């Protein structure tokens, strides 16, 4: 609801909050349905039934996600990889496994085309922006000592951040 309240107004866009599996939309009323970085949180079989109901014939369904952050200087990239794949492992919820499988283990309703491997989100981030992104990870939100862990991560990151650099280039490879 807070994100919807902050969304920019547009005369041709109607914002609403509803369960993805029970949208309340009319039958065959949508040309496209896009799920961005969220399909792993949904009850996919129920969502697929809802999409089949609300999507017009020939409509487009797209599941888009992203692989772990890439493109950092080598020492920082190693730190990011270890943080994501090892240090936070005990706090990742079970649904995150779908992301690691690149959604290939979820039933897509109909024919599918993979997202081209060269598509990615390009980022130019400060240390604070990187930490802000990391703090949104579900594992960090579930960690027993998240505030202390974030303080420790900041200290580690300060030691790894290249001297004299304000912002660094990263990218998130798209998948789906």
Q: Which ranges hold each PLM region?
A:
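Tryptophan-centric aromatic hotspots in well-structured domains and transmembrane helices
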Residues: 6, 23, 41-42, 65, ...
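Hydrophobic beta-strand segment of the Class I
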Residues: 33-34
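A short, conserved alpha-helix within the catalytic core of class I
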Residues: 41-54
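Conserved catalytic/acceptor-binding region of the Class I
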Residues: 52, 56-123
């Amino acid at each position: 609801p807070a994100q919807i309240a902050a969304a920019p107004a547009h005369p041709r866009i109607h914002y609403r909050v509803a369960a993805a599996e029970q949208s309340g939309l009319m039958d065959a009323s949508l040309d496209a349905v896009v799920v961005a970085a969220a399909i792993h949180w949904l009850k996919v079989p129920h969502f697929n039934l809802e999409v089949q109901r609300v999507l017009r014939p020939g409509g487009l369904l797209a599941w888009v996600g992203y692989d772990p952050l890439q493109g950092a200087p080598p020492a920082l990239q190693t730190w990011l990889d270890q943080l994501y794949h090892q240090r936070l492992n005990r706090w990742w919820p079970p649904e995150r496994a779908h992301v690691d499988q690149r959604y290939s283990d979820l039933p897509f309703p109909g024919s599918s085309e993979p997202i081209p491997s060269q598509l990615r989100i390009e980022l130019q981030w400060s240390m604070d922006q990187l930490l802000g992104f990391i703090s949104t990870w579900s594992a960090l939100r579930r960690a027993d000592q998240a505030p202390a862990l974030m303080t420790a991560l900041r200290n580690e990151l300060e030691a790894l951040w290249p001297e004299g650099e304000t912002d660094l280039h990263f990218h998130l490879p798209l998948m789906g």
